[in-house]
């Protein structure tokens, strides 16, 4: 007795089609997700790149109407203007003299603090040599001590150096937030578009930008062939 198997191929075809459609659906979903993620990453990276550069501010133009109004008010006041101006000048001169006195006092305070705080700039080698020579009747032979003191003052950190180091770390963190594949865009804005930076790049970061730009513009490849 022969059993009909005509339904079996139909089931297999239906299963194959369903399985294929399911695969396509998953693949399309994955591609869509990756595309949207890349768009988000691109827009976020563009914002990070723009944050490196200064934004040009529009020029402020003085209004002529304001000038006319100010002139009219001056003419309406008449004789009272001179007295007002005299009072202003008097107040300003008093404030100026007070400011000068404050500046003078501050400069004296700074000079005194510099004298009390020894650093590489105010370290006087000649005075130090005289002081050391007076401590002994023997011929002076402590130049090495002066040299070590100068070296110690030269290598000790200052407020300015610490501030510069902190600024460098902050700039490095900002730059590292940009993906490496976007360095060529930074090069284009910096070199081609001639946009000024908000803050200077660290040397290592600047070299990475130049390398990416030269690779993109084939400067490295042309240089290897002896071409400009």
UniProtKB/Swiss-Prot annotation:
Record's InterPro entries?
A: Fluconazole_resistance (IPR053274), Gag1-like_clamp (IPR025124), Lock_Gag1-like (IPR053969)
Entry keyword Transcription regulation: no
Q: Which UniProt keywords apply?
A: Cytoplasm
Q: Which domain of life is it from?
A: Eukaryota
Residue span of region Disordered = 90-115
Residue spans with biased composition (Low complexity)?
A: 96-113
Localization per record:
Cytoplasm, Cell cortex
Cellular component per GO, a single term = cell cortex
Q: What does this protein do?
A: Deletion results in antifungal drug fluconazole-resistant phenotype.
Another remark in the UniProt entry says: Present with 3140 molecules/cell in log phase SD medium.
Q: What is this protein called in UniProt? A: Uncharacterized protein YLR407W
Species, as recorded: Saccharomyces cerevisiae (strain ATCC 204508 / S288c)
């Amino acid at each position: 007795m022969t059993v009909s198997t005509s339904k079996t191929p139909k089931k297999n075809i239906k299963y194959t089609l369903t399985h294929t459609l399911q695969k396509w659906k998953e693949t399309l979903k994955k591609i869509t997700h990756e595309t949207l993620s890349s768009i988000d990453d691109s827009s976020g990276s563009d914002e990070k790149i723009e944050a490196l550069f200064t934004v040009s501010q529009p020029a402020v133009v003085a209004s002529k109407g304001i000038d006319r109004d100010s002139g009219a008010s001056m003419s309406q006041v008449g004789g009272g203007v001179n007295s007002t101006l005299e009072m202003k000048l008097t107040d300003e001169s008093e404030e100026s003299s007070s400011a000068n006195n404050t500046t003078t006092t501050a400069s004296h305070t700074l000079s005194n603090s510099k004298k009390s705080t020894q650093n590489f700039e105010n370290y006087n080698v000649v005075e130090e040599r005289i002081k050391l020579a007076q401590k002994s009747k023997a011929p002076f032979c402590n130049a090495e001590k002066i040299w070590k003191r100068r070296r110690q003052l030269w290598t000790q950190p200052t407020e300015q150096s610490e501030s510069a180091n902190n600024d460098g770390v902050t700039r490095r963190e900002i730059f590292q937030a940009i993906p490496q594949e976007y360095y060529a865009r930074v090069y284009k804005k910096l070199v081609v578009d001639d946009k000024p930076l908000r803050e200077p790049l660290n040397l290592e970061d600047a070299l990475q930008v130049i390398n990416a730009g030269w690779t993109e513009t084939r400067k490295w490849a042309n240089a290897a062939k002896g071409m400009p």
